[in-house]
Amino acid sequence: GDIIIVTMLFMEPHINAVSDALAARRDHCDALVCCMSAPEVMQYTRMGRFTMDSEPSGPIALLKRLRGTPKDGKPAATGERQLAMLRRLPRILRFIPGTAQDVRTYFLTLQYWLAGSEDNLARMVNLLVQRYAAGPRAVLRQIAREQPPIEYPDVGIYQMEGRQRIVDSADGIAEPEEHSGTVG
């Protein structure tokens, strides 16, 4: 059972510490999501019929072709273009049946994770439960609802108080409450 999420594993000692456990649990958990990690960790990803342990085929092969190839030694895509593609892909994959739906869920999981707010992490867990909860956890699928990732501005102001925590202009900053200083 369970849904396992693995991120940011690059250092060899860390990989070695969990690699055997991931391999043992991979085929016995509801889903194993590995993202932004070393290739030897990424290969453990299994979400429905989508796995990363084999040669790309179907939707993944198509996505690699769409990505393009480097020209004149320049990178194929800047970080900004890659993020734009990451946001666009789930909208495209929504209309392709089969394994593409699991690939879509993988890219949505990346979006939730990269946005990194409490709300997005809760939405990510809801999505994964709705899609992959099995066995005694299958009843949770009826409760969990897929909600799109909350998108935040690339550049913004973080504020602890206020309706929105991240705003992209000074107009969205909450007015401070009137406080008078005290002495002693």
Predicted regions located by residue number:
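An N-terminal assembly and electron-transfer interface module characteristic of large anaerobic redox
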Residues: 2-184
